[in-house]
């Protein structure tokens, strides 16, 4: 099902939840996608902890994402308000046509609903994102879920997908798998 966009006015008060800007309906559940708020920081942290193999950042980092980067991040909540999905990223300052996706997490009970794709697309369809023509991220070689998501996005948007080694194991302290830089694009906003 295609997400439906509701009228959305961001709240000037970051502590207040915003009205859902995207509603996803399915036979199983209704999920709401919106910008994160201060109150979401710890819930995002707990979600990411429950989604291996994702790197877990500090609770403070997720609070910063929920406030300082809220325009380029999104959370998905279920009807009870539990956070079941999260995407973080930013528009690159040195390449304003590129959105760098830092992390995407989908909780177990929301997997298989296409939520990861919908989170990414919800961010890219927001006002102010119209110049974005490329999507980048880094993915470890064995993260099948992330590779699958990016391949599906490239196919859906009819855009090329390229990858190359970005950070080696040595650059990551020898205790982390290498990260490949993965790039989709160019694509047109109407393809999203």
Swiss-Prot record:
Keywords of the record: Acyltransferase, Transferase
EC number of this enzyme: 2.3.1.178
UniProt-recorded name of the protein: L-2,4-diaminobutyric acid acetyltransferase
Family matches, as NCBIfam families: ectoine_EctA (TIGR02406)
Cysteines paired by S-S bonds: none
GO process annotations (BP): ectoine biosynthetic process
Single GO molecular function: diaminobutyrate acetyltransferase activity
PROSITE patterns: GNAT
UniProt cross-references to InterPro entries, sorted A to Z: Acyl_CoA_acyltransferase, Ectoine_EctA, GNAT_dom
Record's keyword annotation contains Kinase: no
Sequence ranges assigned to domain N-acetyltransferase in this UniProt record: 31-192
The protein's annotated pathway: Amine and polyamine biosynthesis; ectoine biosynthesis; L-ectoine from L-aspartate 4-semialdehyde: step 2/3
Family in the record: Belongs to the acetyltransferase family. EctA subfamily.
Top-level EC class: transferase
The organism of origin for this protein: Chromohalobacter salexigens (strain ATCC BAA-138 / DSM 3043 / CIP 106854 / NCIMB 13768 / 1H11)
């Amino acid at each position: 099902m295609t997400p439906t966009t509701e009228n959305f006015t961001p709240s000037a008060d970051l502590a207040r939840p915003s009205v859902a800007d995207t509603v996803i309906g399915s036979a199983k559940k209704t999920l709401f996608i919106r910008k994160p708020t201060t109150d979401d920081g710890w819930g995002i942290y707990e979600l990411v902890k429950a989604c291996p193999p994702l790197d877990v950042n500090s609770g403070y980092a997720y609070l910063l994402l929920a406030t300082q980067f809220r325009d380029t991040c999104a959370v998905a909540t279920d009807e009870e308000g539990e956070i079941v999905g999260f995407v973080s990223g930013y528009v690159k300052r040195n390449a304003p046509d590129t959105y760098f996706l830092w992390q995407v997490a989908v909780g177990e009970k929301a997997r298989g609903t296409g939520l990861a794709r919908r989170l990414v697309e919800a961010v890219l369809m927001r006002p102010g994102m119209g110049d974005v023509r490329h999507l980048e991220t880094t993915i470890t070689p064995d993260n099948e879920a992330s590779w699958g998501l990016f391949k599906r996005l490239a196919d859906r948007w009819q855009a090329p997908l390229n990858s190359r080694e970005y950070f080696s194991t040595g650059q990551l302290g020898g205790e982390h798998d290498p990260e490949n830089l993965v790039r989709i694009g160019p694509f047109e906003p109407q393809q999203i």
